[in-house]
A protein has these predicted regions:
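Non-catalytic alpha-helical scaffolds and adjoining flexible linkers that form interface surfaces
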Residues: 1-23, 28-317
Length: 317
């Protein structure tokens, strides 16, 4: 009896070699959730799968099988958008890691899929997709029941923009100037301004607000680490990249203001055309005179001396 084929749209989260010619792929589907498949022959040059199983590109796929690992039979690329570049690519890889670790296999999550589809589009089109990534991380945490409701603090009072709150997993926001409950001390916490929490709740994040993005990045990273029971590699790499970029910007500003001297290994800028250079030769003979003399054959050198010419001159006609 032929195995029934299923059809769905999805995104490839990760892929790894299975054999010399096949791949294991982890696909996030809208109707079937996260599904692991084997793409037989996908590594061959003549395979119909080549160039279609790329991350962040929507695909329509057909697969079959009753076991844990399904068999991919057909793929249609639904892309038409550029792949993420630079920081956005790293952020997207971190989002794929979150989906792969938090969502169980073959558990439909259409709301998370729609949010991921919007994130994949922002990663390709926006110059800085950090706001979209922070909103996606918090949305997934809320869907998984890990993140708290930001409509009020632990005593039911509204979140105030001018206050600072202590945020800990499995707990509601706590005003930083109030003593914590003893049970709360079992968890790591971080401090977040109420204004940033309100922006996160309302989805009003801006790429120009680095302070809010860094603060909310620490918040989502803390909750994701608790939910995944380990530090996410993508989040750790993004933190290191942000620290490096901030250091590079600080050094650039110090060099520009003259407070910091350039290291000895930094080459001096090249002079402008015509500045500090000798006169331009007007002919081939002049160019040869400016160049260092070359070793000539003995007969050629004797002929030039007999004609009264130097080693860099043309012989007399």
């Amino acid at each position: 009896m032929a195995k029934p084929r299923r059809k769905d749209v999805g995104y490839v989260l990760t892929s790894r070699p299975c054999t010399e010619s096949s791949l294991y792929i982890d696909v996030f589907c809208r109707s079937f959730g996260r599904v692991v498949m084997v793409a037989r022959g996908a590594r061959r040059r003549q395979s119909d799968f080549r160039g279609k199983l790329m991350a962040f590109s929507p695909i329509e796929l057909r697969f079959s099988g009753d076991r844990e690992i399904k068999s991919l039979s057909a793929v249609e690329w639904l892309g038409g958008r550029p792949l993420p570049q630079g920081r956005n690519l790293i952020l997207g890889m971190g989002a794929n890691e979150i989906v792969g670790k938090l969502l169980p296999r073959e558990c439909p999550s259409p709301r998370v899929f729609d949010m991921y589809d919007s994130l994949a589009r922002d990663l390709s089109e926006m110059p800085d997709a950090r706001p979209a990534v922070r909103l996606f991380e918090w949305f997934v945490l809320r869907e998984m029941g890990v993140a708290p409701d930001l409509s009020g603090d632990d005593k039911g009072r509204p979140i105030e923009p001018g206050r600072v709150y202590s945020m800990a997993p499995e707990n509601l926001p706590l005003r930083a100037d109030e003593p914590p409950d003893p049970d709360r001390l079992r968890f790591r916490s971080c401090l977040v301004r109420g204004e940033h929490l309100l922006r996160l709740r309302e989805g009003r994040l801006s790429a120009s607000d680095d302070e809010a993005l860094r603060s909310l990045g620490r918040l989502t990273g803390l909750f994701l680490e608790r939910a995944c029971e380990s530090r996410l590699r993508g989040a750790a790499f993004c933190d290191q990249l942000d620290a490096l970029l901030r250091r590079v910007e600080d050094v650039r500003l110090e060099l520009g203001s003259g407070r910091l001297a350039a290291p000895a290994w930094v080459p001096a800028p090249a002079p402008a055309a015509g500045v500090g250079q000798g006169p331009r030769p007007s002919s081939l003979t002049a160019a040869r005179r400016m160049a260092p003399p070359l070793a000539l054959r003995p007969a050629r050198a004797a002929s030039l001396r007999a004609n009264g010419a130097g080693p860099g001159d043309e012989p007399a006609a």
